[in-house]
């Protein structure tokens, strides 16, 4: 199967209802269906899906204003390919189980049997690692499971006067379960439920978060459109006397190739629960200049967008580049580098095994590197 194609299997029980032709290659049980599966999907089902998405949008817009104050690690992808495409992409249709952490509707039966590991050396000596697996269920469903560990290293503990009294560690752990379903041959919905455990210097907290996603993929035009309502939920055990909000968010995504050009372009819009996202910029690009508040229409618009492009000429390797304007401008009050906001990714696949790597440098003192290793157990067994 091609690397960026979706596999949809229709139930044999429908064969008497369909106008079908035998596969030219004579494969047993393989048919070309000449009608759309849309006719078998009740209109009421599609209406419920759309109504649910609208309801989520209303709730998020009402409560999402300050939702990015805690649990920001939920916005860090575990996919090296997506990290290299700007760090956010909900519409990338690929045969890669790691991409599903961005949108549960990207999980499909073509990923059945995939096992993947990720490791990332992050800012400030932090180390992130995780494991993800997917398995098909029936003719239209797929489930997935994942665990992600984010360790932030050892930090100094001080008293009110600033005297060092010792050290402490901090970490976040996420356990997640996913399910996706092919509603039609082009439309897929998915849900991701995450249990979050945090431990900071002897204090612990727990939370539940849910992602709802939907993806439309047109194979003929290689067009992918997605919508995600991310991080719905809240804390079930707080650190102290106050509850911390999850970074609930609405996201839209577009990915497409054009003609014979072997490049896929992607644009992802996120932080859609709020418009104004001002930042402060130092006039000389260092942390010692005069700071100016930036809150123009253009600035706010581009701080909501992530751009990416990847080469898709072969299913056995890829190269990608991304640009995140928000990452670059967030570093405006620090010593950002020329490449701040840019990221690159590359990967190869040999038979059942795959390797992916991504690199980014948000500012001069922070070089980040992410590694993915994957294996398809079906091809091995």
Role assignments for model-derived ranges:
Residues 55-63:
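Hydrophobic h-region of N-terminal signal peptides that target proteins for export
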Residues 6, 20-50:
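Bacterial N-terminal signal peptides that target proteins for export
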Residues 14, 31-32, 56-57:
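Repetitive helical segments and hydrophobic/amphipathic motifs
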Residues 2-9:
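Extreme N-terminal basic, low-complexity initiation segments
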Residues 63-381:
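Subset of outer-membrane beta-barrel
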Residues 12-13, 54-55, 88:
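Enrichment for repetitive, rod-forming helical segments
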